[in-house]
Structures are given as structure tokens and as C-alpha cells.
């Protein structure tokens, strides 16, 4: 199967349009903090011959595929196995200080969803794993087995925004006392049995629970909350950050960080805005951009995307 059949980059042309003005110089550095199968990055490297890429990913399988895909670019590309809140350490390890661009394409990748054995999908039976890095960390099966009822309720509420969180947490605890819950099919069965018929008609009842477990297993929101400021701190003046998120919890973190950094810190009533009070960032899009119907028809994954972008206007202490 061709890579493009597995993963079509979301809003590719718009992302390139937003990043390109900051990446024109020879030797400009772009960090793709969520490299995946490198669909976006391959296009960026083709379009910008002087560009150097630092690609980060926690998934060794994705890094291997990306490495093959980008091999033709030679020493213009450096790949690092790390979670994206490790951006500072990754750049330090390469001897790179400031960068001209940072790109995030958040959420679970097509590769992870399509490989049944990874356990991300509620529509196919597989071991309950859900780790983006299959070499480290708790699995979803361990979370389901070891968290108490209140902890399960919390993650279903907080990370899945699931109204039936108490019911699902209770049923899971009851079921695991009979036998371990180790597969996605068994977890789906428990959730379906606990779901009122009227709710089942509104969509798959396991969707939010699986999202919550995935976020907990991979600590996605806490990682993002650390990664956003770390990435912005490495941007050179004139550098740009572009972020694609796919659910409201991620987008809320991105929106908050960009809003804070793009707001003047001048005290209310100060007659003159001093240079140190000027915003660090200038927003490049109004609110969050969504995909149009043409893009969604070509690439259904784009249906839930929210794109935000900003440019570094000044250094934090200048």
C-alpha cells in the first residue's frame, strides 16, 4: 500500500502557505514535532530547497517509515525519537538554538489507527494497548485493570467529556472482578451493555471512552501543555508556529498559549506601551481555521481539524 493511501496530509497547502514566509532563507530550520509518516514534511522539503528539518516522533514505527520516505533529502533531515515536549532537548542535542518554524499535527495518526494490533480502534478487536510508543509506559489494559472507579470516572469526564462516565466506570470495575479486560472488543461490549438505547442511537458509545484512555495512556494533554511554550521559546523573531488539532481539549490548550503570548502585558491605564510589554506573538489566522467541504471530501480526517498559527514578533525579554 502506498503511503499516500494510508495518510493524506490535512490542509497541506494552507500549512505550507503559513510556514513558507519564515522558511525562505538558506538553512532555515523547521521542527515537525509530530512527524508521523512525514507527509507534511516531505512536501515542505520539496517546496523549500534550503530547508532543514528536525522531525520528532514518539512512535518508532512511524520514525522508520518517515526515515525511508525522507532518505532522498540526505543531511537536510534529522530524526529524533522523543515525545514532542522534548523539543528543547532534541534541538540542544543537535546543536541548534533558534528555529524558523515549528509544526504540530496532533492526535492519533492514521498509521496507529490502521494497525489493528495497536489497539486504538473501537471498531476492530485487538489487545488494549493504545501506546503511541509501544516500547514504554502503561497500556490501556493496565489503566482499565489498575485505576479505581473514581480515577476511571475522572479520565472519562476530563478527557472524553463523557456524560455517562460514572456508569461506565462502575460497569468496568464490576466486569474486571469477573475476568481481566484485555481486548478492545471486550471493553466495547461492556460499554454497549451499560449504554441506554437512546444514547446508542446518537453514535458509537465507546468513542469517548477510547479517546479518554488514549489521552491518559499517552499523557497527550500534559505533554501538549509543556510542548507549546517550549516550541515558542525556540522560535526566532519572524519564526512561525502552525498547529493542527482535532478535538476541543487539544485546541483549548493551543488557543490559550497563543492568546497569552499574543496579548500585551502592559498594566491597565499605562499611557504608553513599553517594548517589554508588547506581545511576543502575532496571530496569523482569526480564531481557528476549519477545512472546507472540498478538503473534507478529499480527506475525511480533515472534518474535525482546527488550525491555528502565529509569528514570533519579539523575544520574551527584549
Swiss-Prot record:
GO BP annotations of the record are:
rRNA base methylation
Keyword Chaperone present in the record's keywords: the answer is: no
Keywords from the named record:
Cytoplasm, Methyltransferase, rRNA processing, S-adenosyl-L-methionine, Transferase
Cellular component, GO annotation:
cytoplasm
Instruction: List its EC numbers.
Output: 2.1.1.199
Q: Which residues make up the binding site for S-adenosyl-L-methionine?
A: 38-40, 57, 91, 105, 112
Record GO terms (molecular function): rRNA (cytosine-N4-)-methyltransferase activity
What is the name attached to this protein's record? Ribosomal RNA small subunit methyltransferase H
Q: Which organism is it from?
A: Clavibacter sepedonicus
Gene symbol? rsmH
Amino acid at each position: 500500500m502506498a503511503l499516500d493511501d494510508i495518510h493524506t496530509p490535512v490542509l497541506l497547502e494552507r500549512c505550507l502557505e503559513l510556514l513558507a514566509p519564515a522558511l525562505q532563507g538558506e538553512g532555515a530550520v523547521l521542527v515537525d514535532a509530530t512527524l508521523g509518516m512525514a507527509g507534511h514534511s516531505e512536501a515542505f522539503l520539496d517546496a523549500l530547497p534550503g530547508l532543514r528539518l528536525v522531525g520528532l516522533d514518539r512512535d518508532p514505527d512511524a520514525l522508520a517509515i518517515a526515515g525511508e520516505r525522507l532518505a532522498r533529502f540526505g543531511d537536510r533531515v534529522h530524526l529524533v525519537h522523543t515525545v514532542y515536549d522534548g523539543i528543547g532537548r532534541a534541538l540542544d542535542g543537535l546543536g541548534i538554538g533558534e528555529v524558523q518554524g515549528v509544526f504540530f499535527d496532533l492526535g492519533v495518526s492514521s498509521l496507529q489507527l490502521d494497525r489493528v494490533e495497536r489497539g486504538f480502534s473501537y471498531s476492530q478487536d485487538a489487545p488494549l494497548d493504545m501506546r503511541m510508543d509501544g516500547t514504554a509506559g502503561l497500556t490501556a489494559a493496565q489503566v482499565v485493570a489498575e485505576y479505581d472507579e473514581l480515577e476511571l470516572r475522572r479520565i472519562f469526564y476530563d478527557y472524553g467529556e463523557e456524560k455517562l462516565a460514572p456508569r461506565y466506570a462502575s460497569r468496568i470495575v464490576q466486569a474486571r472482578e469477573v475476568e481481566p479486560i484485555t481486548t478492545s472488543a471486550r471493553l466495547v461490549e461492556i460499554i454497549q451493555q451499560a449504554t441506554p438505547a437512546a444514547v446508542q442511537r446518537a453514535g458509537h458509545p465507546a468513542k469517548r471512552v477510547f479517546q479518554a484512555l488514549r489521552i491518559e495512556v499517552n499523557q497527550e494533554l500534559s505533554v501538549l501543555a509543556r510542548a507549546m511554550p517550549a516550541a515558542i521559546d525556540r522560535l526566532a523573531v519572524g519564526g512561525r508556529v502552525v498547529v493542527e488539532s482535532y478535538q476541543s481539549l487539544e485546541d483549548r490548550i493551543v488557543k490559550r498559549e497563543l492568546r497569552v503570548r499574543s496579548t500585551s502585558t502592559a498594566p491597565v491605564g499605562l499611557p504608553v506601551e513599553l517594548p517589554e510589554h508588547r506581545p511576543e506573538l502575532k496571530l496569523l489566522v482569526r480564531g481557528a481555521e476549519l477545512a472546507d467541504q472540498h478538503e473534507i471530501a478529499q480527506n475525511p480526517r480533515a472534518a474535525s481539524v482546527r488550525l491555528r498559527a502565529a509569528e514570533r514578533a519579539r523575544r520574551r525579554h527584549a
